[in-house]
Amino acid sequence: MAAASAQGGRTGGGGGSSGPGGGPTCGSGSGRSGLLDKWKIDDKPVKIDKWDGSAVKNSLDDSAKKVLLEKYKYVENFGLIDGRLTICTISCFFAIVALIWDYMHPFPESKPVLALCVISYFVMMGILTIYTSYKEKSIFLVAHRKDPTGMDPDDIWQLSSSLKRFDDKYTLKLTFISGRTKQQREAEFTKSIAKFFDHSGTLVMDAYEPEISRLHDSLATERKIK
């Protein structure tokens, strides 16, 4: 398949150089092919069990993230993940304190401290649940686009997705938040996962990448108009 793609690329390049006005068209095609070829060379093809919903969703999420970070050169922001890790770290701190205190002051002497740590741990777990449900939601990427002039705040791009259990419909949502106006716009698509994986379970980036780019470009065009 790689050889065939290379053969097609050489053939298309020859046609562009010989025909009038063909240069720009072939150049654009080569740009996209170059990006996809780079992924195929640098990374092993993503191959998963098509019947494993979590693996399917994770592979699609990771590839969508790769498009925004590598093709559009956005910078990932780890604030959401850091918030979750902070809550988990505090929860673990209470568990460790309870363990050490009970070792140094055997039960029942340690009872008040153990009770406090247990209550605190479950409170933190409740906070974590609220955080993941209402703050993180299904967002798996927050990326910043730096203003070229350095005058305006960064634009923010967010990726979120969903794939229901026993369902083949994958939904990818891209959210744009203007750094200057704080206005938020969204675009999404819902497609069958069969469109993006071949019969062996290998992710076909040639079919998936254009869908992501189309989402991005629709929001980027609106941003330029406004």
From Swiss-Prot:
Subcellular location: Endoplasmic reticulum membrane
Stretches that traverse the bilayer: 87-107, 112-132
Swiss-Prot/TrEMBL GO biological process terms: protein targeting to ER; signal peptide processing
Record carries keyword Membrane: yes
InterPro entries assigned: Spc2/SPCS2 (IPR009582)
Topological category with respect to the lipid bilayer: Multi-pass membrane protein
Top-level taxon of the source organism: Eukaryota
Modified residue annotations for N6-acetyllysine: 169, 191
Pfam families the record matches: SPC25 (PF06703)
One GO cellular component term noted in the UniProt record for this chain: endoplasmic reticulum membrane
Keywords assigned by UniProt, alphabetized: Acetylation, Endoplasmic reticulum, Membrane, Transmembrane, Transmembrane helix
Modified residues (N-acetylalanine): 2
Region span, Disordered: 1-37
Gly residues: bias regions: 9-32
Membrane-side (Cytoplasmic) residue stretches: 2-86, 133-226
Lumenal membrane side: 108-111
Function: Component of the signal peptidase complex (SPC) which catalyzes the cleavage of N-terminal signal sequences from nascent proteins as they are translocated into the lumen of the endoplasmic reticulum. Enhances the enzymatic activity of SPC and facilitates the interactions between different components of the translocation site.
Similarity section: Belongs to the SPCS2 family.
Record's subunit section: Component of the signal peptidase complex paralog A (SPC-A) composed of a catalytic subunit SEC11A and three accessory subunits SPCS1, SPCS2 and SPCS3. Component of the signal peptidase complex paralog C (SPC-C) composed of a catalytic subunit SEC11C and three accessory subunits SPCS1, SPCS2 and SPCS3. Within the complex, interacts with SEC11A or SEC11C and SPCS1. The complex induces a local thinning of the ER membrane which is used to measure the length of the signal peptide (SP) h-region of protein substrates.
PANTHER family named in the record: MICROSOMAL SIGNAL PEPTIDASE 25 KDA SUBUNIT, SIGNAL PEPTIDASE COMPLEX SUBUNIT 2
Name of the protein in question: Signal peptidase complex subunit 2
Gene name for this UniProt entry: SPCS2
